[in-house]
């Protein structure tokens, strides 16, 4: 996939979320089952002895803040109850993050930045990455849920995961979900309809499906025939290659992350998302 086509896919998704922020947020209310196991693993690794220090959570592509709301409730009922909490969210769509029906108003010590995440990462030189990419302190827990499937090409997915690792303190936890939607026959049909429609009415100038890589698809939205989202379906080998790619970026030869867990969760099947839990070295 060439850079221009990747940029067009990113803009396609940015436009989708700007135009459909309210309707999308309305369908994203309940916490994902996989988040509970994610937090259980994270809390096993975080030392409760430093309770006077803030516990910081960083969320890349935070959407309507429903993970922050879940994490606040989960942390408040854990051994970290009473510990100062700080939440840092980054997203390219402020309308989604501050949606009136969302959770932003409920979260204390919430710091939100509107950032074109992929546009920012595409401009950086992978050989000369800054220590941190986003304006936030190093986090105890860094997460990225429901976003990696919107990142075109393996090159940029590695950059996203690398940026997430850099935003995490040594010993901190990094959690990512990978959407495996093509294992769902309903989603297979939905993608087929959207891609057939795109052949007749291209979603943007220069649309060329031959640029797609294995696992790349277009998906529509509700009954809006003009709405498209670029999404990537992951398999386990691609996820392994992604984690390996982040390790390859290390400048001192040490692996910047180690894998703690990998599991399926969510959806009617319980296998809609593949979660990977890493620990920063």
PLM region spans:
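Conserved helix-to-beta-strand junction in the class I
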Residues: 163-170
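A conserved beta-strand element that flanks and buttresses the S-adenosyl-L-methionine
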Residues: 143
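Short catalytic micro-motifs in class I SAM-dependent methyltransferases
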Residues: 146-150
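Local beta-strand N-terminus motif with an aromatic residue
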Residues: 54, 138-139
């Amino acid at each position: 996939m060439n850079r221009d086509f990747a940029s067009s896919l990113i803009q396609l998704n940015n436009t989708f979320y700007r135009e459909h922020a309210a309707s999308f947020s309305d369908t994203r209310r309940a916490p994902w089952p996989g988040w509970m196991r994610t937090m259980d693993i994270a809390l096993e690794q975080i030392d409760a002895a430093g309770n006077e220090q803030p516990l910081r959570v960083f969320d890349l592509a935070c959407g309507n803040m429903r993970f922050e709301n879940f994490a606040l409730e989960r942390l408040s009922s854990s051994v970290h109850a009473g510990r100062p909490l700080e939440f840092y969210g980054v997203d390219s769509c402020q309308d989604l993050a501050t949606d009136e029906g969302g959770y932003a108003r409920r979260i204390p010590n919430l710091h939100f930045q509107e950032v074109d995440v992929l546009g920012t990462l595409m401009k950086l030189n992978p050989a000369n990455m800054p220590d941190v990419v986003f304006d936030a302190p190093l986090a105890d827990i860094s997460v990225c849920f429901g976003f990696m499937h919107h990142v075109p090409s393996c090159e940029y997915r590695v950059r996203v995961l690398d940026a997430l690792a850099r935003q995490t303190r040594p010993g901190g936890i990094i959690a990512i979900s990978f959407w495996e939607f093509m294992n769902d026959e309903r989603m297979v049909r939905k993608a087929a309809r959207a891609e057939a429609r795109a052949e007749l009415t291209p979603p943007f100038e220069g649309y060329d499906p031959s640029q797609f890589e294995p696992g790349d698809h277009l998906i529509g939205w509700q009954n809006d025939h003009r709405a498209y989202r670029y999404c990537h379906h992951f398999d386990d080998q691609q996820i392994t290659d992604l984690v390996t790619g982040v390790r390859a970026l290390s400048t001192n030869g040490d692996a910047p992350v180690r894998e703690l867990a990998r599991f399926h969760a969510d959806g009617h099947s319980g296998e809609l998302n593949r979660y990977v839990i890493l620990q920063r070295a």
